[in-house]
Amino acid sequence: MKPKSGWIEANLLRDFEAEGTDAHRLCTLEDGWVERFGCDVLITFKRVLARERLIQELYSWASTVRFEFRRIFARFLPRKNEEREAPGLIFGDAAENLQTIATERHLKFGIDFGAGYSVGLFVDQRENRRYVRYIAPKRLLNCFAYTCTFSVSAACAGATTINVDLSKKSLARGRENFALNSLPTIDHRFIADDVMAVLPRLARKGEKFDMLILDPPTFSRSPGGKTFHVESDFETLLVSALELAERDGRVLVSTNCSALREHALEVMARYSLKAARRAGIFHRQPPLPDFPVGGGARSIWLILR
């Protein structure tokens, strides 16, 4: 089957490889997409027919652009997050380790296709991680840190970081990402706790940061039963975070929630700045060349004054 529009061009593939990146989107269609992680490919699909079509188009596209891959994994995108399952292997050696390593501008990140629905790296945050390295903050607070990829980007530029996430396993993978890049963790803290509980504690201690990352899940539940809904709780989260931001600090406000478009993020950000009695301007990173217009996470950087 000849690949239809939606697949990246060969020159973009070469550009990624030239900059030391082998983790990125390969194709985006209405009912599915394909991503690359090192030598492996991950297909996300909404319908079985979409999966089969993407598999056939992948082989045709790969032959055309001379792209070699080792394995193909696939995962179904259900309507409810609680129904999400880890990807399944559909092509390749089943005896191989489900873990691999992907690179982004020469930084290494661990990928685990058996750890759950998310494999360890969100490729749509690539330009935001690039911005972190460019700004080179001194102290970064990474909320909902997951596998600490933002912190690795900051640490390679000399920052100290605090990483907060409910999952001890995710933070352990974050430590592994530091080790993959030969970054000692002695100046970095990993806190397995509820972000909404940690922020007030840090404020009481007088902690300040010149960069904060707020990329929460659409929904989460702490071991104590407290829930976080991004649509209703993001403003409260941002107001609390602003108490910890230095005067000229930067705060990333980002979400993958389909119900929150970029304009809604702006409205929330303006309200939160006013509530926290802070002033700032908005900054956006360039669009991702491997994503369609408006695709990927919605993100705004607040540059405080």
Predicted regions and their residues:
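S-adenosyl-L-methionine
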Residues: S167-I213
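Non-catalytic accessory regions of SAM-dependent methyltransferases
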Residues: M1-D40, K46
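Conserved SAM-binding motif I beta-strand of class I
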Residues: T160-D165
